[in-house]
Each structure stands twice: as structure tokens, then as C-alpha cells.
């Protein structure tokens, strides 16, 4: 829409995307680190205010520079929102951190899935000014987040009154070197997951149209099925990690998707869609488990860790889109699909993650151990 209206070059479109990626991904770990040291209960509402102003500017922007300002503000809103939201989700989890993280993330996944649909139904028919209509949703979100900020402020007061011994402490005894190694492995896993998902979300429709002659509308329905399955997988991954252990969910999610991903580019049209749904369902269950596993490694740095991995998610998604687009221009859509399907095989390195017993599975083992000890004493 913006390219057609303003006659932007592909380079200018790329710069707009880059500004959004820079502000929404690179800033997140630093904002999360600041929030860990100086919690701000109303930062969630403040972040949504950035988004609100960005949407309003974007709806009336007359040229390139105002559009850059608008997308930069929207990206900053995302950077402020995600790290603190993860902390609030874990505070409200009642110990079921995986479930809470999944519920939080599925909201974002649902919004991402609805984005193309809303663009087709609202923005394209009614033009640039219709972007301002979404400001109403941002205003509603600010009101809700202000109420959440009130609750968060109360929780911070309660936490501040606890003795120093009650401060967050890791449930493991890993050294700094092993923690850094584990975080590095998680980073590689996020790379494999989101580079692969970038190839699917951006080029799956072209793959279906080029190879099978499926219509544009039909290919969009197939992409929506993949994104819908991804949302379901996101919901399932968190509570499953609470029950059986996050390491096993991460392992099964990324490596478990590999066989279906490898078969996808060789299947027929119906088989390709069915396999895409399976891949979306399986591979999307990993991220909430990855975030909670990482925050269990460093429980006093929830904001920084959440910001780091959400930043990686956005940043790698953008890099993956650009890389596979560059590769597709020089080869073919089918070739990039065959290359990208190798990425889930990196899930095998999950085996090098240390075992951390937290959540329900860890608590259950603790209770069993206590019961056994009690019986032996009797």
C-alpha cells in the first residue's frame, strides 16, 4: 500500500522494515535489563502509548521520514511491552509459568495471524487513513494495562517487604560458564526455529502457487491454516513443559518437526498443506518453553532474558525473510524450501542443555522424594 501510494523503492521499503526491526528487537534486552533493576509498574501502558502515537502518525504520514518515525515508535512500544509482560505473566502464573507464558504469547501469534486478514479487509479497501482506526484498540489496551499496572505495583510492594533471603534464587547450581553455554544453545535453537518459520510465513504461499498452481486466495487460506496450527502449538507447549519438563518440550518441538519439514517440499499439494499444519503445531510449542527455561537459568533477570529472546525472535524473523528472499531471487522458491527444511535438525543440540527441574515436574519429584524419606523414617 505504501509503496504504491508514495512510489517508494524496494530500498526504501527495506529501510522502513529495518527501522522497525532495529527498534523492536535490538532495544528489548536493554529495556529488560533496566526493568530488572528499576521495575516500572506502568511501563506496559507507556509502551502501548508509543504504539498508539505511532499508529496515528502512520495513518496520516505524508512521506518517507514521518513513516520512519511512526514505525520506530511502534517498534519502541514493542520493545517496552514484551520484557515486562513476560515478568507480569510469570508473577501471575501461580507457579505454572509455562502455561502463563503460552497464554501471553498466543495473543501475539493470534494478532500476527490476523494482521494480513485485517490488512486485506480494512487497510487495502479504505486506504492509509484506516490505520488510525486501530488506535481504538490501542486505547482500550492502555486502559487494561493501567489496571494491570495497579496490580503489578501492589505485587512489587509485597516483594519489597520480603526478607533478603526470599529474593529470587536459581533452582540449580550451574556455574556461569554452563549458564552461558545453555543460553548460547537456546539462541541457536531460536535461530533454527525462526529462520524456518520466516521461510514458511513469507514464501509458503508462493511455493504452493508455483508448484501446484493454487490460487492466491487458496494459498492464503493454506498459510492461515499453518499460522492457526502455530497458535495451537504455542498454547500446548507451555503447560506441557510444566508437566514433563521444558528441555523435553524444546527437544521434541524443534527436532520433532524435522521429519515433516523434510517431507514437505516433496509432497503433493494436499500432503504439503497437511505437513505444514503438523510442522506449525509441533515447532511452535518450543518458544514459551525456551523463554521459561532461560528465565529459570537466571531468575533475577526475567526482563533481560525475555527481552533477549523476544528480540532474537523479531530480529531473526526479519533477517530470515531478507535472506530467503535474496536466495529465492537467485535460485527458486522450491530450492529455498529444501534448504530451510534442514534447519529443524539443529534441534539435536538440545541434548547438550543441562537438566533443570522446575515447575510441576520438579515439584512432583520433590514431593515424591519427601514422601519416600518420610516413609523410611517411620
Place the predicted regions along the sequence by residue.
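Extracytoplasmic gate region of multi-pass secondary transporters
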Residues: 180-231
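C-terminal transmembrane helical hairpin of 12-TM major facilitator-type secondary transporters
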Residues: 241-290
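Helix-to-loop junctions at the C-terminal end of transmembrane segments
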Residues: 27-39, 234-245, 328-329
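Conserved MFS/SLC helix-loop-helix module at the cytosolic interface between two early adjacent transmembrane helices
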Residues: 26-64
Amino acid at each position: 500500500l505504501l509503496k504504491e501510494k508514495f512510489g517508494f523503492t524496494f530500498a526504501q521499503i527495506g529501510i522502513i522494515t529495518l527501522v522497525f526491526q532495529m527498534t523492536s528487537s535490538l532495544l528489548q534486552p536493554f529495556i529488560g535489563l533496566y526493568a530488572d533493576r528499576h521495575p516500572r509498574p506502568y511501563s506496559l501502558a507507556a509502551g502501548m502509548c508509543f504504539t498508539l502515537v505511532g499508529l496515528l502518525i502512520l495513518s496520516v504520514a505524508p512521506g518517507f521520514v514521518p513513516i520512519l518515525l511512526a514505525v520506530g515508535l511502534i517498534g519502541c512500544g514493542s520493545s517496552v511491552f514484551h520484557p515486562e509482560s513476560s515478568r507480569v505473566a510469570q508473577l501471575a502464573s501461580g507457579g505454572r509459568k509455562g502455561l502463563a507464558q503460552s497464554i501471553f504469547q498466543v495473543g501475539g501469534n493470534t494478532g500476527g495471524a490476523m494482521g494480513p486478514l485485517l490488512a486485506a479487509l480494512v487497510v487495502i479497501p479504505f486506504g492509509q487513513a484506516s490505520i488510525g482506526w486501530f488506535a481504538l484498540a490501542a486505547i482500550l489496551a492502555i486502559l487494561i494495562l493501567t489496571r494491570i499496572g495497579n496490580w503489578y505495583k501492589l505485587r512489587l510492594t509485597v516483594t519489597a517487604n520480603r526478607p533478603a533471603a526470599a529474593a529470587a534464587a536459581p533452582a540449580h547450581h550451574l556455574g556461569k560458564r554452563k549458564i552461558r553455554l545453555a543460553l548460547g544453545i537456546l539462541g541457536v535453537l531460536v535461530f533454527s526455529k525462526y529462520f524456518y518459520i520466516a521461510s514458511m510465513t513469507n514464501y509458503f504461499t508462493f511455493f504452493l502457487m508455483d508448484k501446484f498452481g493454487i490460487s492466491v486466495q487458496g494459498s492464503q487460506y493454506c498459510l492461515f491454516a499453518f499460522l492457526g496450527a502455530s497458535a495451537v502449538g504455542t498454547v500446548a507447549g507451555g503447560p506441557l513443559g510444566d508437566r514433563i519438563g521444558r528441555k523435553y518440550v524444546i527437544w521434541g518441538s524443534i527436532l520433532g518437526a524435522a521429519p515433516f519439514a523434510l517431507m514437505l517440499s516433496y509432497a503433493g499439494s494436499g500432503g504439503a498443506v497437511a505437513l505444514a499444519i503438523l510442522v506449525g503445531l509441533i515447532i511452535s510449542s518450543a518458544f514459551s518453553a525456551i523463554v521459561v527455561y532461560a528465565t529459570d537459568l537466571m531468575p533475577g533477570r526475567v526482563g533481560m532474558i525475555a527481552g533477549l529472546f523476544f528480540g532474537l525472535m523479531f530480529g531473526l524473523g526479519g533477517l530470515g525473510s531478507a535472506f530467503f528472499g535474496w536466495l529465492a531471487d537467485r535460485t527458486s522458491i522450491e530450492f529455498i524450501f529444501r534448504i530451510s527444511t534442514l534447519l529443524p535438525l539443529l534441534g539435536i543440540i538440545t541434548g547438550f542443555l543441562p537438566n533443570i527441574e522446575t515447575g510441576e515436574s520438579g515439584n512432583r519429584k520433590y514431593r515424591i522424594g519427601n514422601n519416600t524419606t518420610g516413609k523410611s523414617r517411620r
